[in-house]
C-alpha cells in the first residue's frame, strides 16, 4: 500500500498540477508524468491506463496536439542516456530532444516513442510499435522500429483527412 501511495503521489498527483493542458483532457489515474511543466496536452486528448509520459530533466518537451488518443501502456520519453564505452550508463549525461505528436494521432497499446521524434497529424501507430524516427501525417505505421505501412483512406467522395495546421500550432506554442 505504501508503494502504491508513493507512486501515485510522486508520478501522478504532484506532476498533474504542473501539466500544461487544454480543455477536456482525460487520463487514467495510473498514468505516470515526469517533469510535467514541460508536457503540453492538446484539448480533447485521452491517455490510457499505465501510460508513461516523461519530459526531459532540463530542456526537452513532450507536446501532444488536440484530440490525440493514447491506448494503455504507451511510453513517451524525451530523454535517453548516453552510451559511450567505458562509463556506466547511469553515470552518462542524458541526451534530451523534444517529442512532438500532431493533432488527431492514435497510438496503439504498448507503443514506445523515443526522444527527438515528430509524428504528423492524424497518424496511426499500431500496437507494440517502437517509434525511433519521424512519421508523416495521416500515415499508418507499425513494427520495431516503426515504419510506414500504409496511409489513412479518404472517406468515400472526400479527400484524405487532414487536421488544420492552426490546431497543431496551438498545441506547440509553449
Protein language model regions, located:
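Terminal amphipathic alpha-helical/low-complexity segments used for targeting or macromolecular assembly
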Residues: 1-17, 22-23, 67, 80-84, ...
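Flexible, glycine/small-residue-enriched loop-and-beta-strand segment within the central core
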Residues: 9, 32-41, 46-117, 144, ...
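Extended beta-solenoid/beta-helix repeat architectures
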Residues: 25-26, 57, 118-120, 135
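Short-chain dehydrogenase/reductase
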Residues: 46, 106, 124, 130, ...
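Glycine-centered loop/turn positions within well-structured domains
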Residues: 60, 137-139, 147
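Conserved acidic donor-binding loop of glycosyltransferase catalytic domains
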Residues: 77-78, 126, 132-133, 149-151
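Beta-rich strand-turn-strand
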Residues: 109-124, 129-133
